[in-house]
Amino acid sequence: MIAEKVLFLVLDGISDRPCEALDGLTPLAAARTPVLDRLAAEGVCGIMDSVAPGIRPGSDTSHLALLGYPPQEFYTGRGPLEAEGTGIHMTAGMIGFRCNFATVDADGLVTDRRAGRISGTEPLAEAIREGVDLSGLGLEFRFEAGAGHRAALALIGEGLGDKVSSNDPKKEGVQPLTIRPGSDDPADAKTARACNEFIRQSREILDGHPVNVRRMEEGLPPGNLLLIRGAGKMGALPQFPERYGLSGSVISAATLISGIGMVVGLEHIPVPGTTGSVDSDLDAKVRAAIGELGRKDFVLMNIKGADEAGHDGKSIQKRDFIEVIDKALAPLLDLKNTLILVCADHSTPCSVKDHSADPVPVVIRGPGVRIDRTNRFDEVSCAEGGLHRIRGRDLMPIILDLINKSHKYGA
């Protein structure tokens, strides 16, 4: 029997390194995961370098690689992908950026790069749209709130470049940086000026906004600064249905992932109650994925909360959320005629509080799969599986072969 459907499940940042608080285990190894372990026992396992050994992948470059779009060939910056995911349609002449709502104190020092993982930022975004004016530079802009502390910006106008730096200092207790051009090209200088002006005007708006006033009264960090980075122009990506002969959907509360999916031709399926954080309604997300498999060949589903716990250095919270994920995945065990692939997009070690180059576990379960002897889904157990060590770009060819849609190489 050959599977006709594919569920591609990315457990964002779930992979880790040994944690002292977990007696030297990773959060995944320490968690009770009967569903993931059953998938491992009924499938073929391995470990995977999302981009290449030793390369620390971003969520953008890793997801491109997982979908069979090697970032070395197709990546043009995270900003335009994030913008697409928030509903900003990127066209020629637009420069896209990813943004964070962050917190600065009275001395202008960054005290929280994610403003306490603020949510409900649409009123802040609306105030920025209404109050910021870049017409003096001959430019327009689009700005949209994303999930949690995230947002996206697109600059629109003539003579813009995408080689500019970021104002994000990547640490707290210091001043935000000034955005600078990355070349002598006047187009890059114009973009840098526009970004700095946008940041200046938006900060004036955010400082006194009622949402932030209320947050400060409640002892919460205000979202009173925008950190802008990831500048880029939208590149041309081959469409997924034509590239693979599969219709598809993407289910993700993270605007970056939904943006990548939409850019390559997957239909974005919004799911009420999903947040991209540890409070997300995972049951609703799984139900939506199962429903989409009834009308599409391929469903990409991203679950993100474990990644946030890794970035925050909270190993116990990460372990506990992995157990929540596992429980929510139980209905997938009953899927028929479906190839289920589960992997991480990258490791987010709690000790690093960022992505690392450590390979991630992967399992493929479904009709026709050669079952190996692995019976646990974790970083060490999967390393002993039949897939051995592969790259992210290898996944789609393996999937196509298992569903009998690959093409013979040679006569």
From Swiss-Prot:
<keyword id="KW-0324">Glycolysis</keyword>
<dbReference type="GO" id="GO:0006096">
    <property type="term" value="P:glycolytic process"/>
</dbReference>
<dbReference type="Pfam" id="PF10143">
    <property type="entry name" value="PhosphMutase"/>
</dbReference>
<feature type="region of interest" description="Disordered">
    <location>
        <begin position="164"/>
        <end position="190"/>
    </location>
</feature>
<dbReference type="Pfam" id="PF01676">
    <property type="entry name" value="Metalloenzyme"/>
</dbReference>
<comment type="pathway">
    <text>Carbohydrate degradation; glycolysis; pyruvate from D-glyceraldehyde 3-phosphate: step 3/5.</text>
</comment>
<dbReference type="GO" id="GO:0004619">
    <property type="term" value="F:phosphoglycerate mutase activity"/>
</dbReference>
<dbReference type="InterPro" id="IPR006124">
    <property type="entry name" value="Metalloenzyme"/>
</dbReference>
<dbReference type="GO" id="GO:0046872">
    <property type="term" value="F:metal ion binding"/>
</dbReference>
<dbReference type="InterPro" id="IPR004456">
    <property type="entry name" value="Pglycerate_mutase_ApgM"/>
</dbReference>
<dbReference type="InterPro" id="IPR017850">
    <property type="entry name" value="Alkaline_phosphatase_core_sf"/>
</dbReference>
<dbReference type="InterPro" id="IPR023665">
    <property type="entry name" value="ApgAM_prokaryotes"/>
</dbReference>
<comment type="similarity">
    <text>Belongs to the BPG-independent phosphoglycerate mutase family. A-PGAM subfamily.</text>
</comment>
<protein>
    <recommendedName>
        <fullName>2,3-bisphosphoglycerate-independent phosphoglycerate mutase</fullName>
        <ecNumber>5.4.2.12</ecNumber>
    </recommendedName>
</protein>
<keyword id="KW-0413">Isomerase</keyword>
<comment type="function">
    <text>Catalyzes the interconversion of 2-phosphoglycerate and 3-phosphoglycerate.</text>
</comment>
